[in-house]
């Protein structure tokens, strides 16, 4: 699973996801992509599950680019622990995803297989997504 090799700080504030994606909103590498339509925090496990669904349906043909990276630590207190006494320890890593962000891109397969693969990947994610394709040149 993806996580940063090192960070400046161990814990982070929760924060909010405002506005729409300005960077990363268009296809940059592949011919087809999966675009987020809702703001959400996507966990490293969800990204990995979507990646596996993609590569397995494509039968390892073509190329996959993951355009989001989980760089935000989420802390959690252990079960049955009373409130207070500080913030919990880091439990998982998430990526903040804004609406309009292209999360996955693929190339080297035809449009039908790409659409099926990205639909399977979208089922692993907790947000509404849209299939996007580069206009034929």
Swiss-Prot record:
Xref: Gene3D superfamilies: Ribosomal protein L10e/L16
PROSITE patterns named in the record: RIBOSOMAL_L16_1, RIBOSOMAL_L16_2
Chloroplast is among the record's keywords: no
Keyword terms of this UniProt record: Ribonucleoprotein, Ribosomal protein, RNA-binding, rRNA-binding, tRNA-binding
Molecular functions per Gene Ontology: rRNA binding; structural constituent of ribosome; tRNA binding
Entry-linked Pfam families: Ribosomal_L16 (PF00252)
Keyword Ligase part of the UniProt annotation: no
Stored NCBIfam families: rplP_bact
Subunit structure: Part of the 50S ribosomal subunit.
Function noted in UniProt: Binds 23S rRNA and is also seen to make contacts with the A and possibly P site tRNAs.
HAMAP family named among the record's database cross-references: Ribosomal_uL16
Record protein name field: Large ribosomal subunit protein uL16
UniProt source species: Rhodopseudomonas palustris (strain TIE-1)
């Amino acid at each position: 699973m993806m996580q940063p090799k090192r960070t400046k700080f161990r814990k982070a504030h929760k924060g909010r996801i405002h506005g729409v994606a300005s960077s990363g909103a268009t296809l940059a590498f592949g011919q087809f992509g999966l675009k987020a339509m809702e703001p959400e925090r996507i966990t490293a496990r969800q990204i990995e599950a979507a990646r596996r669904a993609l590569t397995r349906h494509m039968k390892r043909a073509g190329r996959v680019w993951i355009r989001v990276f989980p760089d935000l630590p989420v802390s959690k207190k252990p079960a049955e622990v009373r409130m207070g006494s500080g913030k919990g320890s880091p439990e998982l890593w998430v990526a903040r995803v804004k609406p309009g962000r292209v999360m996955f891109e693929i190339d080297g397969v035809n449009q039908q297989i790409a659409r099926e693969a990205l639909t399977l990947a979208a089922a692993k994610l907790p947000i509404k997504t849209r299939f996007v394709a580069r206009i034929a040149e």
